[in-house]
Amino acid sequence: KLPFFVWSDINKKITEHYLRAAGITLEQKKAINIFLLDANQRVLDIKTGLERSLPASILKFYGELSPQQEPMLMSVNAPVLLMPNLLDPPMCEELITLWKEGEHEESKVTSVVGDKEVTRKHTKVKKRRDFRIMDPGLQKVLQQTIGRRIAPELEKVFHFGGFRFDRFVVVCYDSERGDYFRVHRDNLSPSTADRAFALTLNLNVEEYTGGELVFPEYGPHKYQPKSGGGIVFSCSLLHEALPVTQGRRFALLTFFRTLNNQQK
């Protein structure tokens, strides 16, 4: 028994959609044989050619994937969306390098003090260093890469569509500095009120300990997507980034804003 389903697309209707989304040319189409999908029908790999070893290579590919978790009985869970493979390892490394070689700064918080909105350093609440991505070319690549992978899920899971990206920020939580972000919400000031969902995309999970996200309104559970994977959640949820206890945690952050206001 195969550990996965096999579908035959005789009329090539489904294949055409995948080819178009992947940007594959007409010349390349002739060599395409098999699309390898995950449980959510996202393309993991494309196998080409007619070699005899193709079936064996497919079995090997699926066998080397991270093992599926055993079913767990869930009684309490935060209403969040965990998504793997939003960015590939080279892009994760590129973003970390940008932070290391670029001009990063102490992160600030935006809040309402009295009747005024104030943006300031507030180390009792947040302590980390940020690098804001200003390169239009890289912004476009991230928007297209992440957007096409995450937009269908936002629509399917939360019935949320028609968003626009906020800025992209590469952040670093350093254990030697004792970095953290205390419990907070992401949409409590006038300039952040149209933030609908937040995305935290981990870049180097294998290189640090700690730094998980928690959502205290929904139990003590800790959330940590693998490198290249992200977690999406409503900006109205109370959440916290726990201190990194060893190493440095790098992550890419952005928000999905509604379309009823201009970009802040």
Residue ranges and their predicted role:
Residues 39, 56-198, 202-230, 236-264:
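Fe(II)/2-oxoglutarate oxygenase catalytic core
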Residues 6, 231-232:
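Structural recognition of the beta-strand scaffold that forms the well-ordered cores
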